[in-house]
Regions:
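Conserved structural position within tetratricopeptide repeats
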Residues: 4, 38, 73, 134-135, ...
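TPR/TPR-like (Sel1-like) alpha-helical repeat modules
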Residues: 6-7, 56-80, 86-89, 168-170, ...
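Generic helix N-cap/helix-start motif at coil->alpha-helix transitions
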Residues: 6-16, 40-50, 61-63, 74-82, ...
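Residue-level recognition of tetratricopeptide repeat
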Residues: 19, 53, 87, 115, ...
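Structural motif corresponding to the intra-repeat A-B loop/turn of tetratricopeptide repeats
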Residues: 23-26, 58, 120, 154, ...
């Protein structure tokens, strides 16, 4: 019995309890769904979908919409919830999961097992359980997101692309997700232009764009060196959120990097500082700004203080360690710099910039012969 199992299975007991009560149509089902979705210790975001689906199937569509809307405030990127929001709005008669159907409940338990196996990198066995889950509930297309990711992890890219293509036909949110994942594969296959075209066209076709989709599109453009275009989308978001919005620090960081890459440093600096003002403990933003100052030969002492903080936040990150060592080098504290730059080389031996920095500090410390190699 589950009650006799280790404490680690407490969450599974909660899931079992909800599904058992729903299966037997017990009056407390609604309350149990509320309790599990309000749990702050564990990510039960998926169960907001099950709760909304249960409520909708009971004829309470407006209540189901409210459940989804409230959940999306906490989990704005949740794929299941985003797609179900669209389905409810369009009044699609879809009941991909019904906790009163034994096969659906068993399929979900098999999915939980598959997900756990995937997290342990046991991808083939994970897909075995996913296939069983899909057999028991062929309408629950969310299973395919994990299966495609498993195939991607074992480098079966064609199979992953095929699943994403099929998944993309199941709704607008699924289509956007599938386009991004397919683009990742296309870039890996050296088909960057095709990837950009796919994501751009899919984004433009979205009827229900939200700021998170716009942010993802801006990030995709920036990461693929479409800096000017990305700035336009970052700016759209900044104009529509306040400084306390969770995305604000990320958007100003992204736009700041894009500005820096096209040579507009004053705009970049302003955005990066705004990002840190909104969220001061972003190690990588601290590193990006401080390293940029160091490269320009300005604010070296301030950069050092910032990088020491970044190093405390991310003590084993080679990029931050390299930046910290380089700041010490610029301040002519060569012996201290050597220790950090040597550590950075050990963590990232193939990086040419890190190796150049280490070579420079070796030279300054009198290790001319070693520096040559």
């Amino acid at each position: 019995k589950l009650s006799q199992l280790d404490e680690r299975f407490e969450n599974l007991k909660k899931i079992q309890n909800v599904f058992l009560n729903c299966f037997y149509n017990e009056p407390k089902t609604n309350q149990l769904y509320k309790e599990i979705t309000l749990n702050k210790k564990t990510d039960f975001s998926r169960y907001n979908y099950f709760y909304a689906s249960y409520t909708n199937s009971s004829g309470k569509i407006n209540e189901a919409k409210n459940i989804v809307q409230s959940a999306l405030k906490l989990y704005p990127r949740n794929l299941l919830l985003n797609q179900y929001k669209i389905d409810l709005k369009e009044e699609k008669k879809i009941n991909a999961f019904d906790c009163r159907k034994e096969s659906h409940v068993i399929a979900e338990i098999l999915y939980i097992t598959a997900n756990a196996l995937s997290q342990e990198s046991i991808y083939s066995l994970s897909n075995f359980y996913l296939n069983l889950a899909k057999y028991l509930n062929e309408d629950f297309h969310s299973f395919n997101t994990l299966m495609a990711e498993n195939f991607y992890k074992i480098d079966n890219l064609e199979k992953a692309k095929k699943i994403y293509k099929s998944l993309g036909k199941r709704g607008e949110a699924y289509n956007w997700y599938s386009a991004k994942q397919t683009a990742r594969i296309l870039i890996q296959e050296k088909k960057k232009n095709k990837a950009i075209k796919l994501v751009r066209n899919t984004y433009n076709d979205l009827n229900n764009k939200n700021i998170y989709q716009t942010y993802d599109f801006a990030e995709f453009l920036k990461n693929n060196e479409k800096f000017d275009e990305s700035i336009n989308y970052y700016t759209q978001i900044i104009n529509n959120v306040n400084k306390k919005h969770p995305l604000y620090s990320e958007v100003t960081d992204g736009r700041g990097i894009a500005y820096e890459r096209i040579g507009k440093w004053s705009e970049a600096e302003k955005d990066l500082l705004a990002s840190l003002k909104a969220n001061p403990n972003q190690a990588y933003v601290i590193n990006y700004l401080a390293y940029s100052w160091i490269e320009q030969g300005v604010k070296i002492k301030r950069s050092l203080e910032m990088l020491e903080k970044a190093n405390q936040l991310r003590s084993n990150d080679p990029y931050i360690i390299d930046s910290l060592g380089w700041a010490l080098f610029k301040l002519k504290r060569y012996k201290e710099a050597k220790g950090y730059l040597q550590m950075a080389v050990r963590l990232m031996p193939g990086d040419p910039i890190v190796n150049d920095h280490f070579g420079d500090v070796l030279w300054k410390n009198g290790n001319e012969v070693q520096a040559r190699y």
